[in-house]
Amino acid sequence: MKKVTIRDFIKKKSTKEKITMLTAYDYPTAKIISNTGLDSILVGDSLGMVVLGYPNTLNVTMRDMISHTRAVARANPPQLIVADMPFLSYEIDTKSAVKNAGLLVKAGSDAIKLEGGEEMKDTVKAIVKAGIPVMGHIGLTPQRFLRLGGFRTIGKTKQEEDQLIKDSLELEDAGVFSLVIENTYVDIAKRITEKLNIPTICIGAGPYCDGQVLVINDLLGLSEFTPYFAKSYVNLKEIISNAINQYIIDVKNNKFPEKQHYKERES
């Protein structure tokens, strides 16, 4: 599989070929993904919740994102690597936003993703001007859950719906190459997808986007809580628990290690 680029994303929209994206946070997971036909890896700030055990993404730092981006990049996957910009790494001023985006690219990402709508237009323009591809993210933006009043579906009111559409158009105009739409109503996501020339990637926004993204822990059945819009394709938590319990039994009953697991001196 050849390296996926942002040009491939744009092409897939025109050919109506769905884009597939999953999160990954470490080398072994990225190595497994590298041998699949997945289009893109998102090194998401969701790692704060599913890897580091935080209640939300607000505690994730640039150091965290750089470290995990490097781990994923070391697997040398052909997938497009997109790294999330964590909370307060891009909101303060455009100069620090460009610098932090550059640090993620130096760590191995092919593009960065940031949350927010029209208020992020100047920031997006500055990062793109620096030569760094930007993926937008609207709808439920987890870094802004306090302002939104919690984790909820966005677009219930006409005002919210109009703002989502305006945000999407402003971000496209600012230069994002694609747009994540999270946890909004299916008809809104469909309207946005039809209006934009760039591909949309849905998570909890229905089947009419140009692609889908999931947190890999949800897909593998590893999450403590799986949101309604996610699908588990395997119960890896149960498989891992069973393996650990079997190991305990084998050790206690002297069934592990067996002869093939150690060396004896030759007499």
Swiss-Prot record:
Biological processes, Gene Ontology terms: coenzyme A biosynthetic process; pantothenate biosynthetic process
Cofactor requirements of the protein: Mg(2+)
Known pathway: Cofactor biosynthesis; coenzyme A biosynthesis
Textual note on the cofactor: Binds 1 Mg(2+) ion per subunit.
Alphabetized UniProt keyword annotations: Coenzyme A biosynthesis, Cytoplasm, Magnesium, Metal-binding, Transferase
GO cellular component, one term: cytoplasm
Keyword Cell membrane: no
Molecular function, one GO term: 3-methyl-2-oxobutanoate hydroxymethyltransferase activity
Pfam families recorded: Pantoate_transf
Active site: E182
Compartments (UniProt record): Cytoplasm
Reaction(s) catalysed (UniProt annotation): 3-methyl-2-oxobutanoate + (6R)-5,10-methylene-5,6,7,8-tetrahydrofolate + H2O = 2-dehydropantoate + (6S)-5,6,7,8-tetrahydrofolate
Residue sites binding 3-methyl-2-oxobutanoate per the record: D45, S46, D84, K113
EC number: 2.1.2.11
Annotated residues for binding of Mg(2+): D45, D84, E115
Entry similarity comment: Belongs to the PanB family.
Binding partners and assembly: Homodecamer; pentamer of dimers.
HAMAP family associated with the record: PanB (MF_00156)
Known role: Catalyzes the reversible reaction in which hydroxymethyl group from 5,10-methylenetetrahydrofolate is transferred onto alpha-ketoisovalerate to form ketopantoate.
Protein name, as recorded: 3-methyl-2-oxobutanoate hydroxymethyltransferase
Species for this entry: Saccharolobus islandicus (strain Y.N.15.51 / Yellowstone #2) (Sulfolobus islandicus)
